[in-house]
């Protein structure tokens, strides 16, 4: 039985335990997680927030992170502007990027989710409204979600990963994680056993994410 960490990665934290920069080093996972032998299963950009999975099992790591398995990943995306039905439809059908057409996705507008305030806060332009959408993709190109919305003319302001496969961000605040037991024959579905939530940092918001 493998172990899997579900971690709510805060904004501006690297999805790795070390920073290769000789100067101006960035915050890494080592500031939050002290579990020898655990490594990220996939990645989440420095300027994105939300669910990051880590495991001590190479087989499980491969099953989660391999593009061949096409595990769906769901994001809550705040964009600049009021995104129309035509843009939603194109996100679903595929968006032409420099590295090719994206796979079909699932996308729909959503109400603003009940989540923690970001630190530092998002910079808004007062004269321009914003929209939230839920976007589910099955591939992991570099900065894909941001490039998809930008190609539609709606830059991403805030990006939160809510779900990877059957695992979700529910009940986790930024910097918190849970340690789960996973039966490999059942993965990438959620584990059958789970420990209590572990606080790893005191700088938390006072509201938990809820599925809209």
Residue ranges and their predicted role:
Residues 191-212:
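Intrinsically disordered, Lys/Arg-rich low-complexity segments
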Residues 1-189, 210-212:
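RNA pseudouridine synthases
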């Amino acid at each position: 039985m493998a172990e899997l960490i579900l971690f709510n990665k805060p904004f501006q934290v690297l999805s790795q335990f070390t920073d290769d920069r000789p100067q101006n080093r960035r915050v890494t996972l080592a500031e939050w997680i002290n579990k020898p032998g655990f490594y990220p299963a996939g990645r989440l950009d420095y300027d994105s927030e939300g669910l990051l999975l880590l495991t001590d099992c190479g087989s499980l790591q491969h099953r989660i992170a391999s593009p061949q398995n096409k595990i769906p990943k769901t994001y809550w995306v705040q964009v600049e502007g009021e995104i129309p039905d035509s843009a939603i439809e194109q996100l679903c059908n595929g968006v032409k990027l420099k590295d090719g057409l994206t796979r079909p996705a699932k996308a729909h507008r959503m109400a603003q989710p009940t989540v923690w305030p970001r630190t530092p806060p998002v910079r808004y332009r007062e004269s321009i409204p914003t929209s939230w959408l839920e976007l589910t993709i099955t591939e992991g190109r570099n900065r894909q979600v941001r490039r998809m919305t930008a190609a539609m003319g709606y830059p991403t302001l805030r990006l939160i990963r809510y779900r990877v496969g059957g695992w979700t961000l529910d009940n986790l605040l930024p910097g918190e994680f849970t340690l789960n037991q996973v039966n490999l024959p059942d993965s990438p579905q959620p584990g059958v056993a789970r420990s209590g939530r572990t606080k790893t940092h005191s700088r938390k918001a006072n509201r938990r994410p809820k599925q809209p």
